[in-house]
A protein has these predicted regions:
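Expand to "…catalyze enediolate/carbanion chemistry for C-C bond making/breaking, isomerization
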Residues: 1-152
């Protein structure tokens, strides 16, 4: 369970993710958003999952965080379609959850850094890039995308 903040822009952050994470993170983002929706009293999306995980808590912390996660999840679903020419069911779940989006993603709070300490800096984007290069590069592939500059 994580969100890879590889850029402050939720769409660019999705585009910078490797194939493995594009597949995995659409589902995880839908689960976090669904858990936040259920905490607000709405029976939408998936059943609650990992409600005490720092990233799930962050998504639910403010409407602005939820908005960022919605935009990121939708962008991940679009990335999945671009790379694999298929529609991911979790993308449809995220579309359903947009009805609860009443925040401004540019006003999000600083996200937790869910990674080993060795990659952490004051800048969460740089931290997630460090984590990606240090821990994910060995399996990172980019179908129908150029490998991001920070991964070269």
């Amino acid at each position: 369970m994580n969100i890879f903040f590889l850029d402050k822009d939720p769409k660019i952050a999705a585009q910078l993710q490797c194939d493995k994470h594009v597949v995995k993170m659409v589902l995880e983002t839908a689960q976090m958003l669904s858990t936040a929706a259920r905490k607000r009293g709405f029976e939408l999306g998936y059943k609650s999952a990992y409600p005490k995980h720092p990233m799930t808590l962050w998504v639910n912390e403010s409407p602005h965080n939820y908005a960022w996660a919605i935009q990121h999840g939708l962008a991940l679903g679009t990335e999945y379609q671009l790379r694999y020419r298929k529609v991911y069911k979790s993308h449809e779940v995220i579309k359903e959850l947009t009805m609860l989006d009443d925040g401004d993603s540019t006003q999000m709070t600083k996200p937790p850094q869910c990674m080993p300490d060795e990659y952490k800096t004051e800048d969460y984007v740089q931290s997630y890039r460090n984590y990606y290069v240090g821990d994910k590069k060995r399996f990172a592939k980019y179908t129908n995308r150029t490998t991001p500059e920070f991964m070269q």
